[in-house]
UniProtKB/Swiss-Prot annotation:
Descriptive protein name: Alcohol dehydrogenase
Source organism of the structure: Drosophila pseudoobscura pseudoobscura (Fruit fly)
Molecular function GO labels: alcohol dehydrogenase (NAD+) activity
EC number(s) per entry: 1.1.1.1
Binding residues for NAD(+): 10-33
Coiled-coil regions listed: none
Family, as annotated: Belongs to the short-chain dehydrogenases/reductases (SDR) family.
Gene3D superfamilies membership: NAD(P)-binding Rossmann-like Domain
Species classification: Eukaryota, Metazoa, Ecdysozoa, Arthropoda, Hexapoda
Subunit annotation: Homodimer.
Catalytic site positions: Y151 (proton acceptor)
């Protein structure tokens, strides 16, 4: 899929991986890049505009933990501005197993709520045009870092939720896939802690192993968006992009 003249809404598009991905996106000659983030970063917005002045870049403050009704209200404003949204990227995430409720609220519940809100506009059963959802998971979603089970569990939930969305595409008209970064050098990794402090040096230990830069991750992130494969589970690790084959151990029969 060519991203030329597409309208993209990027939740958490100013974070570590998020900002590098936004830089790559504007190089693709989007029509609009709408960034929703908790904290404004005027310098980053100015930089993105300078990379490609032809792309209209808009920022709205957004906390993914707000109720669905508030998200729907914000999306209504965005749709009024850009008319159509082609791609939604759900990228909000924290890695803090000391904050159990907030980790789940940001990493999973917020993603589900944002998705639920945009379906109000996209769902073909309501006359919507459909759309594409790219959810940011993590390699911990299919193989946990056991010292951070809350974070890992929240990312496993993202993978399963997104796989369900993909299978619902014939009903809703909305396709979906996950991009799942491996250990990437960002402030998120440097600051994170373990559940109940079972491993006080968990961040330090992880960084002793091979990692990738956020730029490497961002380049493959955008490649995955361009490939636009419904139901894909992409692994973005050590500068590579690889599809993961999910093994089915049970079938609901419905």
């Amino acid at each position: 899929m060519s991203l030329t003249n597409k309208n993209v809404v990027f939740v958490a598009g100013l974070g570590g991986i998020g900002l590098d991905t936004s830089r790559e996106l504007v190089k693709r000659n989007l029509k609009n890049l709408v960034i929703l983030d908790r904290i404004d970063n005027p310098a980053a917005i100015a930089e993105l505009k300078a990379i490609n002045p032809k792309v209209t870049i808009t920022f709205y403050p957004y906390d993914v933990t707000v109720p669905v009704a508030e998200t729907t209200k914000l999306l209504k404003t965005i749709f009024a501005q850009v008319k159509t949204i082609d791609v939604l990227i759900n990228g909000a995430g924290i890695l803090d197993d000391h904050q159990i409720e907030r980790t789940i609220a940001v990493n999973y519940t917020g993603l589900v709520n944002t998705t639920t809100a945009i379906l109000d506009f996209w769902d073909k059963r309501k006359g919507g045009p459909g759309g594409i959802i790219c959810n940011i998971g993590s390699v911990t979603g299919f193989n946990a870092i056991y010292q951070v089970p809350v974070y890992s569990g929240s990312k496993a939930a993202v993978v399963n939720f997104t796989s369900s969305l993909a299978k619902l595409a014939p009903i809703t008209g909305v396709t979906a896939y996950t991009v799942n970064p491996g250990i990437t050098k960002t402030t998120l990794v440097h600051k994170f802690n373990s559940w109940l402090d079972v491993e006080p040096r968990v961040a330090e230990k992880l960084l002793e192993h091979p990692t990738q830069t956020s730029q490497q991750c961002a380049e493959n992130f955008v490649k995955a968006i361009e490939l636009n494969k419904n139901g894909a589970i992409w692994k973005l690790d050590l500068g590579t992009l690889e599809p993961i084959t999910w093994t089915q151990h049970w079938d609901s029969g419905i």
